[in-house]
């Protein structure tokens, strides 16, 4: 689910935090990609040009086709992807998972009704709702990535949290996902639509964590509370509080505890046994692997291994697979080109460092004004009188 209404809220109140770019503008960047989100996109995507979507046994292969060709496209544009796979969901997510199971049952009933009625549009619509990424899909994708020479990371828990940890550690530039909660986990950059097909012609949307905090006039802790009020995967939200009211409450009271002390109970009903504190801690201290211990390496592809894996039962065109392998090799050789800013190490930003820089700038400005005042006011010269 991500965070309900967050994207629009940022667009309305902190538009400077969003930048649209072409994919080529991320040349030389390392990006952590939410693998499950990608696989879901690939599984529901409508394929054209006579592409094979299943094995001889009828098992889907669209997730492998998508992973293969989209990854090649990223590498063609000088982007180094690392895919991050979900681990076990946190216990607090069980409520959201139960809701998804209910929606799945409803979709199954609706699909049967659409099938009985011969409603082709309805059949397609509800079939898409029933798609889910399985462990087998993920394992096949990992095997494919290994053969392509592209690294992946198994997150102990949420992939978005692990992506954010890689960004904060300086291992990668950004998190690529459609789920906005990567920002709630503290990813300093979020890229949306990066793995969309070229045919959709969607510019990549880059969200800046620092600029959104500045635009919303809140700090990182307050941003987490805002996201909980908007609606997240870990607890219920307060019915009747939409995005506009949520940011007003955060700006007025700064945290959920104070909001609850001042909330009009005749207008809003707080969920019983509301686990907002546990949800907050999940965002502040998520279960992630230590990013410093993760070694990311992009190596040469195994062309023969790719042919063996994708052709045969999976029915990929050998010619296209070999052409793809050659593109991978070419991209690997071109990786010697680097961005100019890669020569300068960027240290992870911290609130203390930012505040110190601001204080230093203010002190320098104050010192300059004092000198100016002394120069213009001293000795009876023709300088301007101090105001």
From Swiss-Prot:
Disulfide bonds: none annotated. SUPFAM superfamilies: 5' to 3' exonuclease, C-terminal subdomain, PIN domain-like. Residues 336-344 are annotated as: Interaction with PCNA. Phosphorylated. Phosphorylation upon DNA damage induces relocalization to the nuclear plasma. Binds 2 magnesium ions per subunit. They probably participate in the reaction catalyzed by the enzyme. May bind an additional third magnesium ion after substrate binding. DNA binds at residues 47, 70, 158, 231, 233. It is an enzyme of class 3 (hydrolase). Residues 345-387 are annotated as: Disordered. This is Flap endonuclease 1. PROSITE patterns: XPG_1, XPG_2. It is found in: Nucleus, Nucleolus; Nucleus, Nucleoplasm; Mitochondrion. GO terms for molecular function: 5'-3' exonuclease activity; 5'-flap endonuclease activity; DNA binding; magnesium ion binding; manganese ion binding; RNA-DNA hybrid ribonuclease activity. GO terms for biological process: base-excision repair; DNA replication, removal of RNA primer. Residues 122-253 are annotated as: I-domain. Interacts with PCNA. Three molecules of FEN1 bind to one PCNA trimer with each molecule binding to one PCNA monomer. PCNA stimulates the nuclease activity without altering cleavage specificity. GO terms for cellular component: mitochondrion; nucleolus; nucleoplasm. The gene is Fen1. Its EC number is 3.1.-.-. Belongs to the XPG/RAD2 endonuclease family. FEN1 subfamily. CDD domains: PIN_FEN1.
């Amino acid at each position: 689910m991500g965070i309900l209404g967050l994207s629009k809220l940022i667009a309305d109140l902190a538009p400077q935090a969003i930048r649209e770019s072409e994919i080529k503008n991320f040349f030389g960047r390392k990006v952590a990609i939410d693998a499950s989100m990608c696989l879901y996109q690939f599984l529901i995507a409508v394929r054209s040009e006579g592409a094979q979507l299943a094995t001889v046994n009828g098992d889907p292969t669209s997730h492998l086709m998508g992973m293969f060709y989209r990854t090649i496209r990223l590498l063609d544009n000088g982007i180094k992807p690392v895919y991050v796979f979900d681990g076990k969901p946190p216990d607090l997510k069980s409520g959201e998972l139960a809701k998804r199971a209910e929606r799945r049952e409803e979709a199954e009933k609706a699909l049967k009704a659409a099938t009985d009625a011969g409603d082709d549009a309805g059949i397609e619509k509800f079939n898409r709702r029933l798609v889910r990424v399985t462990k087998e899909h993920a394992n096949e994708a990992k095997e494919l990535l290994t053969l392509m020479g592209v690294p992946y990371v198994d997150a102990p828990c949420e992939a978005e949290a692990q992506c954010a940890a890689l960004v904060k550690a300086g291992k990668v530039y950004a998190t690529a996902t459609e789920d906005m909660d990567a920002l709630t986990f503290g990813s300093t950059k979020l890229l949306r639509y990066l793995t969309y097909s070229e045919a959709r012609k969607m510019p990549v949307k880059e969200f800046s964590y620092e600029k959104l905090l500045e635009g919303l006039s809140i700090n990182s802790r307050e941003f987490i509370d805002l996201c909980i009020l908007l609606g997240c995967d870990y607890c219920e939200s307060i019915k009747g509080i939409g995005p506009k009211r949520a940011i007003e409450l955060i700006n007025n009271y700064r945290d959920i505890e104070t909001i609850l002390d001042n909330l009009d109970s005749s207008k809003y009903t707080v969920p019983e046994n509301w686990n907002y504190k546990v949800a907050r801690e999940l965002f502040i201290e998520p279960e992630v692997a230590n990013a410093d211990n993760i070694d990311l390496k992009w190596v040469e592809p195994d062309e023969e291994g790719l042919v063996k894996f994708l052709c045969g039962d999976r029915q990929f065109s050998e010619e296209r697979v070999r052409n793809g392998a050659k593109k991978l090799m070419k991209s690997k050789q071109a990786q010697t080109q680097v961005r100019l800013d890669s020569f300068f190490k960027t240290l992870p930003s911290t609130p203390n460092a930012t505040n110190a820089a601001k204080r230093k700038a203010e002190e320098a400005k104050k010192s300059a004004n004092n000198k100016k005042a002394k120069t213009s006011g001293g000795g009876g010269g023709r300088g301007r009188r101090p105001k």
